[in-house]
């Protein structure tokens, strides 16, 4: 890590905070950009820039003061990074951000690379919703294509009775996906040095009996 002096992070939420914690363990300095003065990551970052994610001047300042730049989440205007990545060391670049900002684009890209996904169709209005349901069938999930997270901007449709809640989402472009039964959701963390890609083993941890705080036990 001696070659990297300062890591710039676009976004000061909890993910940014966790990046900073690990960066400090590796001896790196950090500078964080976020519009909120009380952003969680600001508590431990070495430097801060209070500014909007869509402010070209703020992004330029972050890049100029950093040896390498990353972003903590996908809701950063990707078009602003196109020019910046030509001048500064933004390892992830523009493309992953661009793809992850639109669920339709993200799934289409996955299919193009041979990955298996649930059946999906673009939905722009009620007519296209009915066409998509006719093809995919119930149960299915309607999702907004952008700015959805942690279940926000989604509706599970199990039959015609659920169409009313689907209409609430149709004010913006959506995607309809086949419902996939699942037992659990797993997160896979990958890292790359530009040549190699390494991931931690995927595991499912059971603790039995469940640990209890001593104060609760008493």
Regions found by a protein language model. Give the residues of each.
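Hydrophobic alpha-helical segments, chiefly the membrane-spanning helices
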Residues: 217-218
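Conserved small/polar residues in nucleotide/adenosyl-binding loops
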Residues: 206-213
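Hydrophobic anchor at the start of a short beta-strand
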Residues: 30, 117, 174
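ATP-grasp fold ATP-binding core
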Residues: 110, 133-157, 172-186, 200-204
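ATP-binding N-terminal substructure of ATP-dependent carboxylate-amine bond-forming enzymes
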Residues: 1-101, 105, 127
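Short beta-strand-to-turn element immediately C-terminal to the catalytic PLP-Schiff-base lysine
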Residues: 123, 154-159, 190-193
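Glycine-/Pro-rich loop/turn segments that contact NAD(P) or position catalytic residues
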Residues: 98-136
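Short active-site oxyanion
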Residues: 66-69, 117-119, 152-153
């Amino acid at each position: 890590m001696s070659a990297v002096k300062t890591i710039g992070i676009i976004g000061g939420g909890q993910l940014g905070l966790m990046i900073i914690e690990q960066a400090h363990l590796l001896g790196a300095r950090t500078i964080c950009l976020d519009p909120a003065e009380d952003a969680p990551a600001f508590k431990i970052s070495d430097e801060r820039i209070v500014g909007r994610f869509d402010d070209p001047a703020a992004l330029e300042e972050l890049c100029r003061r950093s040896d390498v730049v990353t972003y903590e989440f996908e809701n950063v205007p990707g078009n602003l990074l196109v020019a910046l990545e030509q001048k500064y060391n933004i390892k992830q670049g523009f493309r992953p951000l661009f793809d992850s900002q639109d669920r339709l684009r993200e799934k289409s890209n996955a299919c193009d690379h041979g990955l298996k996904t649930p059946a999906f169709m673009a939905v722009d209005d009620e007519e296209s919703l009915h066409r998509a349901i006719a093809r995919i069938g119930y149960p299915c999930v309607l999702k907004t294509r952008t700015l959805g997270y942690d279940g926000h901007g989604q509706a599970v449709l199990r039959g015609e009775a659920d169409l009313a809640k689907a209409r609430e989402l149709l004010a913006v472009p959506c995607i309809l996906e086949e419902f996939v039964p699942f037992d659990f959701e797993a997160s896979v963390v990958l890292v790359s040095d530009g040549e190699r890609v390494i991931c931690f083993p995927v595991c499912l941890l059971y603790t039995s009996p469940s640990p209890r705080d001593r104060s609760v036990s008493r």
